[in-house]
């Protein structure tokens, strides 16, 4: 059975970005390149209008590459329910108030029943401290919290 994944904007940026000389960024770019074929083979990828909006910003050539990369993905709705959950995540300090878009990524994926959120955002979404608060808030609101992982988490064997 194919697993449902929400692809957050940072993953799209690493996939389409110009090659970096920074060893950490280059490693993430390579992991994302290795992960990307799984999106058509083993996973069912989804994004939101927020990912489309974020992917369309900046240099027009790079924006076109990002938008082309996600053109075939399912687009999840941004509902009032998702907006309320995002606000609850911010209120619980799961994600800092200054980053409401990050909370909305999580909320949209949870409301939509995604199994995973795939992100390189270790600052506000995918770190051990925020993940605890995010999970508690999402579950307290009556939803199952998607597993929050980087792309390279999918590069091993599935049991």
Region annotations inferred by a language model:
Residues 1-47, 54-65, 91-97, 131-134, ...:
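Short, well-structured N-terminal submotif of metal-dependent ribonuclease cores
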Residues 4, 44, 117, 146-147:
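A residue-level structural signature of the nucleotidyltransferase/glycosyltransferase Rossmann-like core
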Residues 46, 76-77, 147-149:
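General small-molecule cofactor/ligand-binding pocket signal
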Residues 49, 79, 152:
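Residues at the C-termini of beta-strands that transition into short coil/loop
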Residues 68:
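An acidic/histidine-cluster motif and surrounding catalytic segment
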Residues 73-130, 155:
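Active-site neighborhoods of divalent-metal-dependent phosphate/nucleic-acid chemistry enzymes
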Residues 126-147:
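C-terminal end-helix/capping segment
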Residues 142-159:
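Short, C-terminally biased terminal segments at protein or domain edges
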